[in-house]
A protein has these predicted regions:
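Acidic catalytic patch
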Residues: 60, 103-145
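Short, flexible loop segments at the rims of nucleotide/cofactor-binding pockets, characterized by
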Residues: 30-33, 142-147
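Short, well-structured N-terminal submotif of metal-dependent ribonuclease cores
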Residues: 1-60, 66-90, 192-195
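A conserved hydrophobic position in a structured secondary element of the catalytic/binding core
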Residues: 19, 56, 130, 169, ...
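Acidic, PIN/NYN-like endoribonuclease modules and their adjacent C-terminal/linker elements
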Residues: 1-12, 16, 143-145, 156-201
Length: 201
């Protein structure tokens, strides 16, 4: 479909929606933006009312785990902007703390995903796999939309392959996506910036 819309303009009716990493991170309050978190919660509630399904892709689960590991690393190192050299140094001088840091981040992510899998309208397992055809499709989508990260192309390819109706995100890079039978939905702030960029604000 031709352009992104805000979450609150979607009509969920026995639909299937895929949630990307940015949406999940905001839903889980990882980013600390209470306004966007509420919008994500409202979108989930609308799906429940509309008897729709929310899916979490294998790529989103992987990236969410990475976010929580990075958060645990930042906490252990007591610095937000750490480098790979910082991590290597920690692994060398305190391997036990390094291992604990990875375990903590991984466990926190697993708990967050498990809680979502037990909550309506989420499916109770990860959706989609990354196969050769997924990679080929992602490469085509990357050429088409010039995403800054190939991971974005993989997210979109998984959504397209699984024929979902909606793709929920708070990432501005998906606003230009125009794929048949797929509607991208974003938060109001992201949508406002997108419309302003188009000169329609």
């Amino acid at each position: 479909m031709s352009e992104a819309l805000p979450f609150d303009r979607a009509y969920f009716n026995s639909s299937i929606a895929m949630c990307d990493t940015s949406f999940l991170a905001n839903l889980l309050a990882y980013n600390g933006n209470s306004t966007v978190q509420q919008e994500c919660q409202d979108a989930i509630y609308s799906m429940v009312v509309g008897k729709s399904i929310a899916a979490i892709s294998v790529k989103a689960a992987e990236e969410l785990t990475g976010l929580y590991i990075r958060s645990a690393q930042a906490e252990a190192l007591a610095k937000k902007d750490f480098t790979q050299e910082d991590l290597k140094a920690m692994r060398d001088y305190d391997p036990a703390l390094y291992k604990k840091m990875i375990e903590n981040g991984t466990s926190t992510a697993a708990e967050a995903l498990s809680a979502l899998f037990k909550t309506k309208p989420f499916l109770d397992e990860i959706t989609g796999t990354v196969t050769n055809s997924t990679i080929v499709l992602a490469q085509e989508l990357n050429k088409k939309y010039s995403f800054p990260s190939f991971n974005d192309s993989l997210h979109l390819a998984i959504a397209v392959e699984n024929k979902v109706d909606f793709f929920l995100t708070t990432d501005k890079d998906f606003c230009n996506v125009n794929e048949p039978n797929l509607q991208v939905l974003v938060d109001n702030t992201t949508y406002g910036k997108y419309i302003k960029r188009l000169g329609r604000a």
